[in-house]
Amino acid sequence: MGQTDRVVYVRTGVANFKPPPLWELASAGGSKTLQEFWEAGKLREIYAEEFLWAGFTRLVTETLNQGIDISRTTTINVAVSYPHEMAQMREDEVAEDFCRRLAESEYRTAFRQTPRVRFTPTHAASASGIVPFNDALADLLERDEKMSMVVAGGNTKGTNRNRPRISPAETTDIFASLVSPFDRRHAKANMLKLGAAALGRAYQHDFDLIKALERFIHAQRLYTHELARRGLSTAHITTHPDSIEDRTILHPLKLRGTGPQSMGYAGLLLATQPPPAGRAVRVVGIGCGVDASSIRDRPSHLFSQAMASAVSTALVQARLPGLGSLKVLEHHNPYPAVPLTELTVLLKALGYRGSVTQALLQNDIGVHGRMICAGRSGGAQVGHAITPTFIRLTFETFKQFLGAGGYPALDLGPDEVAYGGISSVGGHHTFDGYAILAGGRREAVATLDAALEPFDHDHFNGVTERDLEEQAALTGAVIPDGMTLGFISFQETKEGREYFAIARTPDGRDFPFVASPAFFTRLLETAYIGTPIRISPTLQAVEG
């Protein structure tokens, strides 16, 4: 296939993370009512495989309503969030269930032949939506197909055929699937704790950055709220940001800045042919990156090597002409390494003279940014159904290029093309992805010089799997001399205050560790940062 043939368009999409009325009704009465609804079979429609099917049927309906001929679609790439843990199904079981529904439905007549259904197993966790998207790109670029569908569903409440739901604590453990098993076992590390520690380190690194991100979060939620008032939001949380309880859940991580558990679906139709007229949106770059599952093995807790690799690869493929052409960014989440890494790489590559903090505070980048409009869909902080999240963000970017779905039309000249970036974070930056879209007049988009190439998922997935296996087998970490205290985080629980902390090595790496409450209480009464500390190979503070 020649370089000029490597063209993929986003033709349309769907998304919906709004909690169904059924869930609101069933959960309002607490666990007893939820159990009763489940035993009566009334919760079936919110199982992950049901959301997947609902997303597909709505995507087909949308394409037909738009007059798009999908009969040449030969593959449907599907996924559900944490299939083993949340849905309690294997990937092949999900695919078989989908195939059965398709064979028995009226929708099969929309296709010349029954499409194959693919569900690629992955460790990508919260970034897993980029995997079926990447598979669809490979369908079109490497397997000479003309159209490919991407559909994902998820229910992070854990409602499935075997149970009415799981507890938030169990969900937190599942979300930590890409955190080093050794760190989880000995330091009780998880996503919230690592996120809080990273935020604490960011406070020390650049307090103005935190102020910028807080303002950014408020503006994102406000924009989502305004879309919802007009009935146009696909998000889960759409309340006014000032009505959201600004409660610290793990110091200094606040409720308003975190992504709520969600249920819903998202889908896209990708094709090698553009729309017959008007504006077109094309995929021009995609990248992936993986990093060590333990922060002990990373050069920095604030800058994501995985995200940097993903963004850099996507940029090389997309061949943006300059900073002025980058108009839209949809961040997976706003705290803190996603925008810090993503924007650092983008702004440096495109010649911006200033820091990420300056770009945000000066409103060069923001929801109403002078140069780049960022985070208008709200990202994961307004609803995180895991696998569908990246697909929803891609759909929101698509709508912004078309000036549809409540987004104002971009001010583009007749031959001008705008670019947009979408980030996807797996775990605490263990498995990240990035995509770049281009939008504009059909003829201008068609002639772009891009070098789109799907990433090698099997390679990245294998690297991650080997790392997780090695961490699971680890009996003791190598602890360097000269460690000092970096940051102490804590949360209030029914059993009392629970602590989590990181120690810093002389070369700048962070080690998670735990100690007794009395040890941390004494330290918090002092200016503890930089205090010498010793920790054991199993990440316990040597007290006394």
Each model region followed by its residue ranges:
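Conserved "HGTGT" condensation-loop signature of ketosynthase/thiolase-family condensing enzymes
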Residues: 1-121, 138-142, 152-262, 266-267, ...
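Soluble or luminal CAZymes and related metallo-dependent hydrolases
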Residues: 51, 128, 306, 389, ...
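Short coil/turn segments at secondary-structure boundaries
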Residues: 120-128
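Active-site histidine-anchored catalytic micro-motif
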Residues: 131-132
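Nucleic-acid-interacting cores, centered on viral/eukaryotic replication and modification enzymes
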Residues: 145
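Nucleic-acid nuclease catalytic cores
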Residues: 148
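Glycine-rich and small/hydrophobic secondary-structure elements
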Residues: 384-391, 395-399
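Short helix/loop segment immediately N-terminal to the Walker
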Residues: 407-413
